[in-house]
Amino acid sequence: MLKPLLKEVESLTEKIKESDHEIEQIARRDYPETALLEQVSGVGPLIALTFVLTVEDKDRFQKSRDIGCYVGLRPRRCDSGQSQPQLRITKEGDPYLRTMLVEGAHYIISRRGPDTDLKRWGLHLAESGGKRGKMKAVVAVARKLGILLHRLWVTGEVYEPLRNHNLRQERKKIAA
């Protein structure tokens, strides 16, 4: 009874591996800029290719921060007099790219994700966020991940995972 199911699972797993390999080949051959984006932990060929194909033109935005609005990872605002509540995210823009960025953010914040400034920031948000802190942190990290990917694409810089941490350490040495 289980043998046919196991064979089906093996067959599907093999098809997924073939598709992943094909996506990787397309990214390498037709979109070399994806290699810049894959420097970030949590970003593989699928997320990088989705980002490049969705945004299309790296010069489309004046500021990298605008990516958050474009993808729908910006909190909805409803200002009224003195009150400025932060509501849920807008969910405007491409839902597939938003999903991919959130998946990458889940990996970054998880235990398996390597130590980076983005992970430290996300974990700090999760700890100080109360009941829903982890989910809010994931969305915030997804937004920052989109901003980071756009910035790397525009500048062509090499990604430094602990850039802010290293700068703080250097400042402490200078001050001491």
For each of these PLM feature ranges, what is it?
Residues 1-176:
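A detector of single, family-specific signature residues
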